[in-house]
UniProtKB/Swiss-Prot annotation:
Residues 92-101, 161-166, 215-279, 337-354, 405-408 are lumenal. This is GDP-mannose transporter. The chain crosses the membrane at residues 71-91, 102-122, 140-160, 167-187, 194-214, 280-300, 316-336, 355-375, 384-404, 409-429. It comes from Mycosarcoma maydis. The lineage of its organism: Eukaryota, Fungi, Dikarya, Basidiomycota, Ustilaginomycotina. GO terms for biological process: GDP-mannose transmembrane transport. One of its GO terms (cellular component) is Golgi apparatus. Belongs to the TPT transporter family. SLC35D subfamily.
Length: 471
């Protein structure tokens, strides 16, 4: 994953070669305009920024889109690695929590966070990355975010436990809508027509994905148990001649058994008492709704906190995982059953090694996703990365059908995935157009400021003043 013998995270030395005689010439010290808030918004929302140089990620890790090489064969490696890492992470998590009666989700997250901290610490000790040292002030400022992240990953694992991967992936898009309108209310963001159109497609795909459960609600509500004649009420009938009892034949027994099974299955998934039989209120959808709310809250809070702390990518990952360990440990002891019987139920002897290995591997996958994300942006561009993220939702959703055969391949499931995939493409296109418009506006204002400062004195160099900074 590195190029030659040089690590991706190692800073590269930048030299400026001056032409002969350049020392006697007046240098052009025009300073480019500072990035606007819209330019920095993608990074603050958890996505990539368009241009960023930092010793922690390599001096030339992330360059301007105009300096990026054209997407070709060399860019396939980071793109494929990013897609493979995200798909693997989802599939392994689904395998881990989908066991019969599994209820130790917080313990799984505790192990994953410990593995993540260990991997980052090893990379820092090996000199691959640089981390900010632990201090009480940063820990105190970041603790609310770590607690919120615990709820994000906990509710996400519970939703993934009860829902199939396709429905989970489709409903995860609704988080984007909450974040967008949260930015409108608190950060002065705006939603363009193209982005709004993508939101409508996201909602439509979610309705299609949940249509089977919605239909089940009306079907169960209209169920009526066939009447059983009094003569065979107890399952026995009496011979009118001898008076002897014999097993009665009920011609509606098959239909009754099917109705009872449907009612029992729907009631078993209810999380709210008093709504037995209504599959729409199953715990999977409740956990998914909570996950969307927690995820949006986490992203919006991080946008404020990251300005206060000045964290970089690896600092954020390290603090998130490190500070979440005591929170996960406390919540696991308070909420989950740590008895020997329950631990043996969740980690049976015949699957114990496989489950623990999968949990450790999924913790390492989180690090791999962060690395491949930066690699993909470095090798291509932030625009290409956003499109890859939208395209990647299709194989992630299809992975549930391939590995777990859930949901079955039906017109409804395929339509939901297709509409959700199209919604992601429209959203990525709309955000890219919005970013381009913001860049054009920034360049126009920069050129205007340069011409105004240069018009004061024809012999002076056009420069921006410090008051021109937007940050």
């Amino acid at each position: 994953m590195s190029s030659g013998s040089r690590s991706f995270f190692t800073p590269q030395e930048t030299r400026l070669e001056l032409p002969q005689g350049a020392a006697h010439q007046t240098p052009d010290i025009t300073r480019p305009a500072s990035p606007s808030e819209n330019d920095r918004a993608p990074f603050l929302n958890g996505g990539p920024s368009d241009a960023r140089e930092d010793v922690r990620m390599g001096a030339k890790a992330l360059r301007n889109d105009s300096e990026k090489p054209a997407v070709g064969i060399m860019a396939l490696a980071p793109i494929l690695c990013y897609c493979a890492a995200s798909i693997t992470m989802t599939v392994v998590n689904k395998f881990t929590v989908s066991g019969r009666g599994f209820n130790m989700n917080l313990l799984v997250l505790l192990i994953q966070s410990t593995v993540g901290v260990t991997c980052v610490w090893i990379a820092e000790r090996a000199g691959l990355i640089q981390l900010r040292g632990l201090n009480a002030k940063d820990a105190w400022n970041w603790m609310p975010l770590s607690i919120m992240l615990v709820f994000v990953i906990w509710t996400g694992s519970k939703a993934l436990q009860y829902l199939n991967i396709s429905v989970y992936t489709i409903f995860k898009n609704l988080t984007i809508i909450l974040i967008a309108y949260g930015e409108v209310m608190w950060f002065g963001g705006r939603v363009t027509r193209i982005v709004l159109c993508s939101f409508l497609f996201m909602v439509l795909s979610s309705v299609i994905a949940a249509w089977s459960d919605i239909s089940n609600v009306f079907a169960i509500g209209n169920l009526s148990m066939p009447h059983t004649p009094d003569s065979i009420m107890g399952g026995m009938a009496k011979d009118p001649i001898t008076g002897a009892l014999f097993p009665a034949f009920d011609p509606l027994k098959t239909e009754k058994d099917a109705i009872n099974a449907q009612l029992q299955s729907a009631s078993a998934n209810d999380v709210i008492e008093g709504f037995q039989g209504y599959g729409l209120l199953s715990s999977g959808y409740v956990w998914m709704a909570l996950n969307c709310i927690c995820s949006a809250t986490y992203v919006l809070l991080m946008r404020k906190r990251i300005k206060v702390t000045g964290f970089k990518d690896w600092d954020t990952m390290f603090y998130n995982n490190f500070l979440s360990i005591p929170v996960l440990l406390l919540m696991s002891f308070l909420v989950e059953d740590w008895s020997y019987a329950n631990l043996h139920k969740n980690f049976p002897d015949d699957k114990q090694t496989k489950l623990i290995s999968a949990i450790v591997f999924s913790g390492a996958c989180a690090i791999l996703i962060s690395y491949t994300t930066a690699w993909c942006i470095r090798a291509t561009s932030s625009t290409t990365y956003s499109m890859v993220g939208a395209l990647n939702k299709l194989p992630v959703a299809l992975s549930g059908m391939v590995f777990f055969h859930d949901p079955p391949v039906t017109f409804s499931s395929v339509s939901a995935i297709a509409v959700g995939f199209f919604a992601g493409l429209v959203y990525a296109f709309g955000k890219n157009k919005q970013a381009e418009a913001a860049k054009l506006g920034g360049h126009a204002s920069a050129n205007g400021s340069s011409s105004m400062s240069g018009s004061k004195d024809g012999s002076s160099l056009p420069m921006h003043t410090f008051n021109d900074r937007k940050d």
